[in-house]
Curated annotation (Swiss-Prot):
The gene is araG. It catalyses: L-arabinose(out) + ATP + H2O = L-arabinose(in) + ADP + phosphate + H(+). Gene3D superfamilies: P-loop containing nucleotide triphosphate hydrolases (3.40.50.300). It comes from Ralstonia nicotianae (strain ATCC BAA-1114 / GMI1000) (Ralstonia solanacearum). Residues 5-240, 240-501 form the ABC transporter domain. The complex is composed of two ATP-binding proteins (AraG), two transmembrane proteins (AraH) and a solute-binding protein (AraF). This is Arabinose import ATP-binding protein AraG. It comes from the Bacteria. Keywords: ATP-binding, Cell inner membrane, Cell membrane, Membrane, Nucleotide-binding, Repeat, Sugar transport, Translocase, Transport. InterPro entries: AAA+_ATPase, ABC_carbohydrate_import_ATPase, ABC_transporter-like_ATP-bd, ABC_transporter-like_CS, P-loop_NTPase. The keyword Iron does not apply.
Length: 511
């Protein structure tokens, strides 16, 4: 069968970097084709060219054998091509209904027919099996729910080609199951699908074949997933063999560095108490909605606590705002990198140095009022090299970097900060390739070996089991249990994560 969609010698150059170099391959109708590669390999750039966001510097796209050009995203949609980017394209202030029908709202005489729009939205969401309130504003939804809105929008446009870039990175288990069903239904309908994921289990479960990128070039093409093993995929992606992605390095933890006692906030069901020792990596696991990120934000001062105490190195401390936590040496790498972790319009150097107090020079009154540009450049170059951040230069806007390199820059920000005592890192490797994951784990081990207490939040259970010295499990807004590494099996952790909260009335009757 001839390819429905073809990439013919696609090249793209940005200042200082060649993102794509003469990439050619095709996709047939009724197939799911995987795209694999490390962060910065060029996968997302190719999808942005397909979706009309970027224009190629060389080569062409062909649909049914005819060359096409998409000057913008609207032209691509009109041609039946929908791209779901890793960075969501939704409007937070609008409702689910408004986002799904944006640009297509039914109207008469200049007025939107709200009743018809609402009925259509409810019917379509029910048809594809997604449980969302059409009236809910997206800013009040979780990242995973917003991702489902983006996916639904592409499906409801009846696109002939649908490209998905890391679609499950923010989804719950149930939402992932819904997505898998939708992808299989679309394949059965004869649509052509492109699927980018760093989760190799998903690639083997969904894709018929795959193409592998490395450094902007196509390095391998597999017609059938039966022709390749997981180990071969990883070796092709990173250009080297990775035997153990986690590379766990055992340590002997020291005294308790962070102790949380009876911490309570609006989104927790019960007061939370736990401790993290010097040189220890504690994994915090729970299903979506369990309260993991909410607990971290309370410790960090991003949300206001209603009760409880935070004790650091044996001394109770007062954290009323994020600045208080940072001054005490408690730092956070947030779950939502784009919205909370980076300043997209600023350079890599500025994002690394934004909290680095040692790069300030004293001004009037002895206050550190002035930025030492030379020292900032030196700091940025040091951590770009140390963490292997792929960027043409330190002044590159950070929004142009891949998700994995953005995460490394956020880590570099706190590595550059003197006096870090506690690192809270939320979803450290979400949307990140195998090679970059291994590098980030090594950084966490190095920090622990320096005596930093690390609290690692992750929804990926293998990551928790592979990296953590001890595991805390949350369920329904409370800490459901704690397991040492030797006892932390998938069965034991999930048993705690799925354990329902005991009804106080039932507990009283039992007593």
């Amino acid at each position: 069968m001839s390819a429905f969609l073809e990439f013919r010698g696609i090249s793209k150059v940005f200042p200082g970097v060649r993102a794509l170099s003469e990439v050619s391959f095709g996709i047939e109708c009724g197939r799911v084709h995987g795209l694999l590669g490390e962060n910065g390999a060029g996968k997302s750039t190719l999808l942005k060219i397909l979706g009309g966001d970027y224009q190629p510097d060389g080569g062409q796209i062909a649909v049914e054998g005819r060359p096409v050009a998409f000057p913008n995203a609207r032209a691509a949609l009109a041609a039946g091509i929908a791209v779901i980017h890793q960075e969501l394209q939704t409007v937070p202030e609008l409702t689910v209904m408004d986002n799904l029908l944006l640009g297509h709202l039914p109207s008469r005489g200049g007025f939107i027919r709200q009743g018809e729009a609402m009925a259509w939205t409810r019917a379509q969401l029910a048809r594809i099996g997604v449980d969302l309130d059409p009236k809910a504003r997206l800013k009040h939804l979780s990242i995973g729910q917003r991702q489902m809105v983006e996916i639904c929008k592409a499906i409801l446009r009846d696109a002939r080609v649908i490209a998905l870039d890391e679609p499950t990175s923010s989804l719950s288990v149930r939402e992932t199951d819904i997505l898998f069903r939708l992808v299989k239904d679309l394949r059965a309908q004869g649509r052509a699908l492109i699927y980018i994921s760093h989760r190799l289990d998903e690639i083997f479960a969904l894709c018929d074949g795959c193409t592998i990128f490395r450094d902007g070039r196509k390095v391998a093409d597999f017609r059938s997933m039966a022709d390749v093993t997981r180990e071969q995929l990883v070796a092709q992606m990173v250009g080297r063999q990775i035997d153990d992605i986690f590379g766990y390095r055992p340590r002997a933890p020291g005294d308790v560095r962070l102790r949380v006692e009876g911490l309570m906030g609006p989104k927790l069901a019960e007061p939370a108490s736990f401790a993290v020792r010097r040189g220890e990596i504690v994994g915090l696991f729970g299903l979506v909605g369990a309260g993991r990120s909410e607990l971290a934000r309370l410790v960090y001062g991003a949300d206001r606590k209603t009760a409880g105490t935070v004790v650091l190195d044996g001394e109770p401390i007062r954290i009323r705002a994020v600045a208080d936590a940072i001054r005490q040496g408690i730092v956070l790498c947030p779950e939502d990198r784009k919205e909370e972790g980076i300043i997209g319009c600023r350079s890599v150097s500025e994002n690394i140095n934004i909290s680095c107090r040692r790069n300030r020079r004293p001004g009037w009154g002895g206050f550190n009022l002035f930025v030492d540009d030379r020292q900032e450049a030196k700091t940025a170059d040091h951590y770009i090299a140390r963490l292997r951040i792929k960027t043409p230069h330190r002044d590159q806007p950070i929004r142009l970097l891949s998700g994995g390199n953005q995460q490394k820059a956020i880590l570099a920000r706190w590595l550059a900060e003197d006096g870090m005592r506690v690192l809270i890192i939320d979803e450290p490797t979400r949307g990140i390739d195998v090679g970059a994951k291994n590098e980030i784990y090594q950084v966490l081990y190095e920090l622990a070996e320096r005596g930093v207490a690390v609290l690692m939040i992750s929804s990926e259970l293998p990551e928790i089991l592979g990296v953590a010295d001890r595991v805390l499990v949350m369920s329904e807004g409370r800490i459901a249990g704690e397991l040492p590494r030797a006892q932390a099996t998938e069965h034991a952790v999930l048993n705690l994560a799925l354990r329902p909260r005991r009804d106080p009335c039932v507990a009283a009757q039992a007593a």
